[in-house]
């Protein structure tokens, strides 16, 4: 019986990644929502991870996050010109009809990131089993630890939340 060859592409959604970034440019509240859920490594397409980190950096410094400041900061960071171009950044804003759905877009990005991490973890476990140097018990222990570590990252990008924002949240409750 022949197995069908399946072209495997790592899980990702270009549209969701673009929508998260576009929403963050459009709305300061979307920045907070996105940074609570994501880290730059969650983006499959590197350019959006770079934009994400740059916007978080601007936001954490209390600077406006708009087309001009973002483009200027990207140029300072010496990123590739295609990422720092005004057209590239502006196209992200025009691609998003509303920032109201940023949480949904961010969840898609996060889910795909977790899928990629699970695939990588599965490959590591598979390789351990094929190599056969460790006992089954040791491989099981390593697997359990790695799965637990992965589960602990589900919460998102809490590392980016500024102290002032945390302080405000504490007073709201």
Regions found by a protein language model. Give the residues of each.
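Conserved catalytic-core motifs characterized by acidic clusters
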Residues: 3, 133-136, 157-158
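Charged, amphipathic alpha-helical linker segments immediately N-terminal to NTP-binding catalytic cores
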Residues: 145-165
